[in-house]
Amino acid sequence: DPFRPQMLGEGGLGLASAGAVIDAREAHFAAVREMFETCTVFIFTLGLTEAWLTEDGMALPVPPGVLGVTEGASAASFHNFGLSEIYQDLEEVLADICIVNPQLRVIFTVSPVALAATFEPRHVMISNTLSKATLRLAAEMMRERHARVCYFPSYEIVTAPVNAPGAFEADLRSVSPLGVAQVMALFNRHMLSGGEAAAAAPAAMPAPSLNATASPLSDEERAAYDARARIICEEDLLATGPGP
């Protein structure tokens, strides 16, 4: 995806030419088309509401300058998407996908990973709460309107006070391997069972000890997890800076 430059090129430094970007774009779009045409269930995770937009309306993966590229940075503008915008976008995306895949089912989730920074003139915790609440409500509106849509509470599983300590890393933002294991265990139990209740979240979430339900990770497993986690979201660059 050319809009995610750290995912492409040697050392994650982006592609070398405009022609290479065009080629990568065509391959990316072909893969996206194939995915939407052939998948039976699409899991759509909503992460944050703040964005930086180019003059023609394209959204950047990180704020201008974060990756060390200043060219064109002044042309990008900050935008914090509101509930009505997000809901309209989700409706349009779902309608477009269902044209090529009428039988598709969609599972919405909200990421429990907190914002690393905010451009709004307020504390990041306040922006994070508003962002997650807005996305959660948008997902609920989609669930209420469409029979093909359901919601899986990964956000609630990790952040609920009833959960045991250990769902977050030491930075209190990143979800720990124990937290991921808890989410996936509940997802497997309630969404992959094959029964009629598989599309619905449980009425009451259990509160098992994370430390009691997941085996300790070896150093090799932890290194592999950390390496994979680094490529998931460029928003992490706001907290850690660009990688090598």
What are these regions (language model features)?
Residues 1-244:
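Extracellular glycan-modifying ectodomains
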